[in-house]
Amino acid sequence: EENTGFLTRKGVKIEERVYRDNSHKSSEIISIESVGKQDVYCPTVDSDKHLWVCNGLITSNTEFIQPLFDDMTSVCVISALNLVHWDEIKDNPQMIKDAFMFLDILNEEYILLTEGVPFMERARKAAINKRDVGLGTLGLAELFQMKGFAYGDVQSRAINKEIYSTIRKYGEEYTKEIGEKLGSAPICKEAGMTRRNASIMMIAPNKSTSFISKATSGGREPFMSNMFLKSLAKIQYVFKNPHLEKLLESKGMNKADVWDSIQDNNGSVQHLDFLDKQEKDVFRTFSEVAPKDIIDLASDAQKFVDMGQSLNLVFRKNYTLQDIYEIHKYAWEKDIKTLYYAYPSAHAALEKDGESWDTCVSCAD
C-alpha cells in the first residue's frame, strides 16, 4: 500500500508520562488519513506539547540532532561550559578535554548501569556503538555583557566563533587521543576512523542549569529581562542584572527610581536617556534583539557543533505570517538544523514602525 502515516497506530497513546502527583498525561492518535505519497504537514495535533505531524511522523520542537537507526535509541549525555569563565577556559585546553572525559565516563557508567535492564536495550546499544556525547555552553549573553559587546555586533560574532572553534578543536583532539588508548566507538571503527565518540558537541537550552550557575544566561539566548522576580520553592527574590548594576553605579544612577523605571518597562533600559546607544545595545533584552542577530550567531557556531543547537527566538506582535516564514527560511539558509521554542514579544512597545525581524546591530553578511 502507498500510505503516509501510521495506519496501524490509531488509538495508541504517545508521550505518556506519570508525574509526581500521580497524574497522567499523554497524547493519543485519534484518526489517520491516507493521502498517497505526497508530503503532508499537519500542525493541528491536539496537544499541549507542541506535537505535530510531518509525513506521518509525530514530531515536536527539536533539542538536538542525531542520526536515526532502526535498532538504536539516541542517548543524551550532555554538559555545558560556563562562558562567564571563558577567559580562564580558553587558556587551559586540558579543562576542555576534561569536560569531554567527564561525559565519556558518564556514557560508560550508563552502559554499565543499563545492562540487563528491560526496555533499555536500544538505548544501551546506542551508547555502546556510538558513544555520543554533547559538550555545549551556557552564559554566552552574559559574557557579551561582561565585555561590553552588543548581541550580534562584530566583537560578539568574533568571540562566538573563537569559543566554538576552540571547543571543537580540543574535543577532536580528545576523542582521537582516547580512541587510540581505549578504543574507538564501534560505528567509527567500522568507518575506518579513530574516534572514541561519534558526536561530541551540542548546545542545550540550559535554562535551569544557568539559573543554578548564579543566574547566568541560558544556552544561546539573551536575558529575558534586566530585572525580574524569581519564584523558587520557598522564596522569592528580585534579580537585577549585575553588569547593568555596575554600569549604573559608575554613572551614579544605581538608584531605586531607576530600577523602578526598568521594572515598569519590562526589564528594558532603552528609555534611559543617560545611557549611550552602545550601552543600550549591550543590555537589550531577548525581545529587543532581532532574530537575525540570534540566527547569525548560531550559524557561525553551527559550523563546529555537530549535534545541533536548542535555538529559541522571540516573535514580536507586529510580525506578520510572512515575517515568521522569512525567519524560518533565513535560519534554514544559514544552515541552522532546528529551531526550538518561539516566545511571544515581552511588550507592545516593540511594535515600532520600520523595525523588522532582520534589523541587526552589525549586518556583516
PLM segments and residue spans:
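HINT superfamily self-processing domains
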Residues: 1-61
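Hydrophobic, well-ordered secondary-structure elements that form the walls
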Residues: 15, 43, 78, 140, ...
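Catalytic alpha/beta core of large soluble enzyme barrels
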Residues: 33, 107-109, 113-115, 201-365
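Structured core elements
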Residues: 39-44, 52, 77, 82, ...
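Short helix/loop capping segments that flank catalytic or ligand/cofactor-binding pockets
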Residues: 49-55, 60-61, 73, 86-87, ...
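Function-dense linear segments that define catalytic or interfacial modules
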Residues: 62-127, 137-143, 147, 216-217, ...
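Conserved active-site and cofactor/substrate-binding residues in soluble primary-metabolism enzymes
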Residues: 73-76, 90-101, 128-138, 158, ...
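Internal maturation/activation junctions in enzymes
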Residues: 96-124, 128, 132, 147-206, ...
